Regions:
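Generic N-terminal amphipathic, Lys/Arg-enriched alpha-helix
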Residues: 1-9
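Poly-acidic low-complexity segments
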Residues: 8-13, 123
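Active-site anion-handling motifs in enzyme catalytic cores
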Residues: 11-13, 25, 65
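Short, well-ordered alpha-helical scaffold segments within catalytic/effector domains
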Residues: 11-18, 40, 60
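N-terminal signal-anchor module of multipass membrane proteins
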Residues: 17-25
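Active-site-proximal beta-alpha core segment in soluble small-molecule metabolic enzymes
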Residues: 30-128
Length: 128
């Protein structure tokens, strides 16, 4: 019996999908979202097999895990954060670029205090 929670992956299917992704969107043209698989081992496989060096994270904790695993070359925080100290520590520890998606003045101020790059999220009337 497999203990739960457990991540079970069909590596042949995973590798096939990575190969397809790499062919369609090589390198940094695709930014896989870490929350989809929550595994630095799979992120490393995406990097090593598919050449993907840019990743999207939902939380600072996911970003910290990626940096700790040596996968912090180009990270995007998709959700806002108000923790400037923690974000600043992450920016200083990361060997590459840390970008924060901002959709409010408060998040923009946090990103600026942390010296993070920003991606401005504009509501064009189709809120998600």
């Amino acid at each position: 019996m497999i203990p739960t929670p457990s991540l079970v992956v069909d590596l042949a299917a995973f590798d096939h999908n990575v190969d397809e992704m790499a062919r369609e969107r090589p390198g940094s043209a695709l930014r896989p979202h870490v929350k989809a698989f929550k595994s630095t081992a799979l992120a490393r496989r995406l990097r090593d097999r598919g050449g993907h060096r840019s990743f999207c994270c939902a939380t600072l904790r996911e970003m910290e895990g990626m940096v700790d695993a040596g996968l912090g070359e180009d990270l995007l925080l998709a959700n806002e954060t108000l923790d400037a100290e923690r974000l600043g520590r992450l920016v200083r520890r990361s060997p590459g670029r840390v970008t924060v998606a901002v959709d409010s003045e408060a998040t923009l101020e946090v990103a600026a205090r942390a010296s993070a790059s920003v991606l401005v999220d504009v509501d064009v009337g189709m809120p998600r």
